């Protein structure tokens, strides 16, 4: 296992007024040619309807995409990271009433030099909150897992509404 500098157990918000990492909308899906799903260009995204079954759907999407990009070594960590980010968005970022949007959540994964970025956009502007649950708690460890598995964990507001939470994973030496 390669060593890397991790950002640790904190979320790093963007600078005030900074542009979000990315924001996906239904219209941008068509603009980016993503209506076909995964691709080999190093960018793939899918809309999620905000249901609890989105976590396994997201894991499968990431697995298929990374296998297509010949990044099988990242599948275990990336699928767990994405599963936790999607689960947090479903549990904490959606109103109980159905959102008017067909896809209130968007999952995007893309390659940057040396990194894989896994990002989830949701309609809530409430910042994500890392917790330190006691040993008997049955939940509250998701972002801690993401921090432990990733090289960095960030979030930013995505005007006009919502936020994007993303984690980066270092690419294997051969892929970087």
What kind of region is each of these model predictions?
Residues 1-44, 90-176:
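Conserved beta-strand-loop-beta-strand hairpin that lines the nucleotide-binding pocket
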Residues 73-97:
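Conserved ATP-binding N-box helix of the HATPase_c
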Residues 33-76:
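Helix-loop-beta hinge of the Bergerat
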Residues 56-59, 63, 79, 83, ...:
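Conserved terminal C-lobe alpha helix of the protein kinase catalytic domain
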